[in-house]
């Protein structure tokens, strides 16, 4: 059995590096003071401290939060705004990373700007680029990404549809931040900058542009008789003339209605919307439909009158045919003209529908 001092020394060696940093040890190298991440099992890149005091990489916490808003070790709930306002262990390290160690750095495209890769991913990209590789794989927030160094795009290995541009540029170009962490600490900016993807791309400005849609596009264009499209906002100069003509046609007698019945339905439909009030450019669809419905009622009343007149003429024609058939059977020759027309009109109004033949 080991001595008590040996057990203590063994347990200290098994502690994470961040706990070794609290101990005063002369043979500990400065590089070992960087905490280790329990998610990616590597040294932390931009370490953040959760409310439960557990330390992880910022991107590792971000990827794990998609599965559940809880700590990966103790399962304590993570606040909703933690990714917007993370608690960095060393904010100076973020500023130093943005300045870089060399002349060039690697960036990926975001909305309204470029994000700089974290130091570890930048080293992997630079190493693959210097060796002339066509592509390389990167582990970001628990997802495997493929960097296409020929087309300068990145995408998830299991989802090729979502692509993002990447580039190799000088270190001093304007940038939004590093690995999803903004360089500016303005509270208003941070609240609006909710990052939605693992590689730190934001999607706030997309909602403001997509919500604005023109109202005029929802108005249906009018179709004229010759098949051309006319816009309600640009009426023809003869609109007032066609308005007077349409009402004049509606007030004609039965003969005029009979002539109207030979016209096509397309002409009636064309007169209804054009005979309404001339709409302004900002006229809504409801106003256009109400004007069209008022004219359609006038046209429908004329159609009903024409329908009743047609039925009366059909009854007269059937009665005339019945009289001529019976006159042939009795052997009496009659002419259709003369009193036949008068007798037919009387017989057609009888309720029983029977006709009696009176010889003259």
Curated annotation (Swiss-Prot):
SMART domains attached here? RING, WWE
Q: Which residues form the WWE domain?
A: 92-168
Question: Which residues lie within the region annotated Disordered?
Answer: 259-360
SUBUNIT field: Can form homooligomers. Interacts with PARsylated AXIN1, AXIN2, BLZF1, CASC3, H1-2, IPO7, LIG3, NCL, PARP1, XRCC1, XRCC5 and XRCC6. Interacts with DDB1, DHX15, IQGAP1, LRPPRC, PARP2, PRKDC, RUVBL2, TNKS1 and TNKS2. Binding often leads to interactor ubiquitination, in the presence of the appropriate E1 and E2 enzymes, and proteasomal degradation.
Name of the protein in its database record: E3 ubiquitin-protein ligase RNF146
- Spell out the subcellular localization from the entry: Cytoplasm, Cytosol; Nucleus
Q: Which terms in the Gene Ontology molecular function aspect does this entry carry?
A: poly-ADP-D-ribose binding; ubiquitin protein ligase activity; ubiquitin-protein transferase activity; zinc ion binding
Q: Where is the composition biased (Low complexity)?
A: 295-305
Checking SUPFAM superfamilies in the record gives: RING/U-box, WWE domain
Reactions catalysed, semicolon-separated, are:
S-ubiquitinyl-[E2 ubiquitin-conjugating enzyme]-L-cysteine + [acceptor protein]-L-lysine = [E2 ubiquitin-conjugating enzyme]-L-cysteine + N(6)-ubiquitinyl-[acceptor protein]-L-lysine
**What CDD domains does the database record attribute to this sequence?**
RING-HC_RNF146
Composition bias (Polar residues) maps to 307-333
Q: What does this protein do?
A: E3 ubiquitin-protein ligase that specifically binds poly-ADP-ribosylated (PARsylated) proteins and mediates their ubiquitination and subsequent degradation. May regulate many important biological processes, such as cell survival and DNA damage response. Acts as an activator of the Wnt signaling pathway by mediating the ubiquitination of PARsylated AXIN1 and AXIN2, 2 key components of the beta-catenin destruction complex. Acts in cooperation with tankyrase proteins (TNKS and TNKS2), which mediate PARsylation of target proteins AXIN1, AXIN2, BLZF1, CASC3, TNKS and TNKS2.
Compositionally biased region (Acidic residues): 284-294
Q: Which GO terms describe its cellular component?
A: cytosol; nucleoplasm; plasma membrane
**Zinc fingers (RING-type): which spans?**
37-75
Q: What is its EC number?
A: 2.3.2.27
Q: Which gene encodes it?
A: RNF146
What residues bear Phosphoserine in this entry?
A: 290, 294
Ubl conjugation found in the keyword field: yes
PROSITE patterns linked to this entry: WWE, ZF_RING_1, ZF_RING_2
Residues binding a glycoprotein = 108, 111, 115, 145, 154, 164, 176
UniProt crosslink position (Glycyl lysine isopeptide (Lys-Gly) (interchain with G-Cter in ubiquitin)): 85, 95, 131, 176
| Changes after translation | Ubiquitinated; autoubiquitinated. Autoubiquitination is enhanced upon poly(ADP-ribose)-binding.
Keywords (A to Z) from UniProt: Cytoplasm, Isopeptide bond, Metal-binding, Nucleus, Phosphoprotein, Transferase, Ubl conjugation, Ubl conjugation pathway, Wnt signaling pathway, Zinc, Zinc-finger
Q: InterPro entries attached here?
A: RING-HC_RNF146 (IPR044110), RNF146 (IPR033509), WWE-dom_subgr (IPR018123), WWE_dom (IPR004170), WWE_dom_sf (IPR037197), Znf_RING (IPR001841), Znf_RING/FYVE/PHD (IPR013083), Znf_RING_CS (IPR017907)
